[in-house]
From Swiss-Prot:
This is Developmentally-regulated GTP-binding protein 1. Belongs to the TRAFAC class OBG-HflX-like GTPase superfamily. OBG GTPase family. Its cofactor is Mg(2+); K(+). Keywords: Acetylation, Cytoplasm, Disease variant, Dwarfism, GTP-binding, Host-virus interaction, Hydrolase, Hydroxylation, Intellectual disability, Magnesium, Metal-binding, Nucleotide-binding, Nucleus, Phosphoprotein, Ubl conjugation. It is found in: Nucleus; Cytoplasm. It comes from Homo sapiens. The ThrRS, GTPase, SpoT (TGS) domain is not necessary for GTP binding nor for the GTPase activity. It appears to play a regulatory role favoring GTP hydrolysis mediated by DFRP1/ZC3H15. Residues 290-366 form the TGS domain.
Amino acid sequence: MSSTLAKIAEIEAEMARTQKNKATAHHLGLLKARLAKLRRELITPKGGGGGGPGEGFDVAKTGDARIGFVGFPSVGKSTLLSNLAGVYSEVAAYEFTTLTTVPGVIRYKGAKIQLLDLPGIIEGAKDGKGRGRQVIAVARTCNLILIVLDVLKPLGHKKIIENELEGFGIRLNSKPPNIGFKKKDKGGINLTATCPQSELDAETVKSILAEYKIHNADVTLRSDATADDLIDVVEGNRVYIPCIYVLNKIDQISIEELDIIYKVPHCVPISAHHRWNFDDLLEKIWDYLKLVRIYTKPKGQLPDYTSPVVLPYSRTTVEDFCMKIHKNLIKEFKYALVWGLSVKHNPQKVGKDHTLEDEDVIQIVKK
């Protein structure tokens, strides 16, 4: 591992020395590809044994969504977690052997949301130190990451945490690159760009792919892509997670400074100690999770608005709804009656491919 770390340090130093311009873009692209490969070795060490990615650190996923809290010590993370869970929790705090504490599951707008403290991520974890690797395996399964910062010293810490997560292949508040990539048996590298490219040319693309021993592939660039974008697509193990920056301790700054913070994207200022602005934070969490609540209506009865079936926004068809309740339900499915925003008239008879919207009411009719 130490030789891998030494190689990483060497490449990072060379990248820092290299001026960024058209002439060096090709060389930098190569260095970035080498760096990505070395980082992957650290995260998934060779040998295959060793208990897998989450050795001794397996946190059962409960509820409808999972939020990971990341932050340096003494930024008020524990206070925020316990106050949020204390105010909005229906479940007592519970502990995991190697995780400090998990304050539990909060219930918000009918959804159960699991809160996880992710310790040790930011202490050189991406370099394989400590238990960082196991923690990251859990972080990658989160639906949302909250980076908790001290409002009096946010910027330096923000960058360190972002770099640490980036090093693990976690991409915050970004979408997967719009790049088509398909390996083939022969024919060399075939590059197509549907729009002008400011960084990638045929030579750079070929050299990055050669670093991965790929000499035959079709590559389609559908947006102005960077070397990092191409590497992310080739690596294929990146996760794209929304992130909110929680700026704590606003009781120690002026109103003018608070106004400036409100203009920063993806930010919510709070005081964990005084429980200030928790409503704003919860509302933003809800917006970023994009959960879809579906209410059930048994035949001849009123809809049950107390316990919705909660679906992730990427899987909201009637079939997804049935699978969430029980996998046998889809076998007995005849059609569904739906009331709500997803239909033109109430109720409307729909099939299993119909896409539901938040707060729709559904009645399943069996064969």
